[in-house]
Regions:
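Short, charged beta-turn/beta-strand-edge "cap" motif at the junction between a beta-strand
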Residues: 116, 154-158, 200-203
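A generic signature of intrinsically disordered, low-complexity regions enriched in glycine/proline
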Residues: 59, 168, 184, 207-211, ...
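Short beta-strand-centered segments at strand-helix junctions
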Residues: 6-55, 61-113, 118-151, 162-195
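Extreme N-terminal starter segment of soluble prokaryotic enzymes
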Residues: 2-4
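Histidine-centered metal-binding segments
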Residues: 203-227
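Short, basic/aromatic-enriched C-terminal tail that caps enzymatic domains
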Residues: 194-199, 222-223
Length: 227
């Protein structure tokens, strides 16, 4: 696979502020690293927090909940990232957003051993994205904030194209694409898998003559690579 990009599955998790962390776990509490993540300086902490959703069938019944890992370091806002499947199971409203874009997003309750915090916003389904350094972006011919299509080859030869994947560029990043667990299941994303940027427009190898069966784009499986 040419110009391959490592594809990683990002399972549900929580980011918190230091203030929220101390409400949940007690004054002066600090996150401790359990496992370093692929992005420099990021880590899965030893702490887990209970995310409490809403019982939509019976508002007076027990509220669904799940324990999620807290990722570090602490941030300047609280954010809960789940898949659509998680959101349904927990009765949460979770719009697709880029990380940090939480205004008007879903609400929930966070519960720790020392206290609870009601979040009026912050629950999202993270938009699939690619972390790139400026050098990576130049090599791939893309810009920060650009939406691209990525062909991912999962296990068992399952080929899946993920459109509307946003490119995020920073010298602090390391090249990797992040998808959630729903997307990973769709492409049989177990183990180490890779993707490559493709174009959905251009010369087509089937009889739609490059206009797709809906009149737009390329519909065949032979997608055209960005040079």
């Amino acid at each position: 696979m040419e110009n391959k990009i490592l594809v990683e599955t990002s399972a549900r998790h929580v980011h918190v502020t230091q203030e929220t962390l101390e409400v949940l776990f007690g004054a002066g509490h600090q996150l401790e690293c359990r496992k370093e993540l692929s992005q420099p300086g990021q880590f899965a902490s030893t702490d887990r927090v209970t995310v409490i959703g809403y019982n939509k069938k019976d508002p007076n019944g027990p509220r669904p909940q799940a324990a999620l890992s807290i990722l570090g370091p602490v941030r300047d806002h609280n954010q809960v990232e789940v898949s659509f499947t998680d959101a349904r199971q927990l009765g949460l409203e979770a719009p697709v957003r880029e990380s940090g874009d939480i205004k008007g997003s879903g609400k929930c309750t966070l519960k720790g051993p020392a206290g609870e915090v009601d979040l009026e916003e912050g629950v999202i389904v993270a938009k699939r994205h690619i972390h790139m350094t400026p050098e990576d972006a130049e090599a791939f011919g893309v810009e920060n904030g650009q939406n691209v299509a990525v062909l991912v080859e999962g296990q068992g030869g399952r080929m899946t194209v993920f459109c509307d994947t946003v490119v995020r560029v920073s010298p602090k990043y390391k090249l990797a694409m992040h998808i959630d667990t729903d997307e990973s299941n769709a492409c049989c994303g177990s183990g180490t898998i890779y993707g490559q940027l493709v174009s959905l427009e251009g010369d087509c190898d089937c009889d739609c003559e490059g206009e797709g069966h809906d009149g737009e784009g390329c519909c065949c499986g032979h997608h055209h690579h960005h040079e």
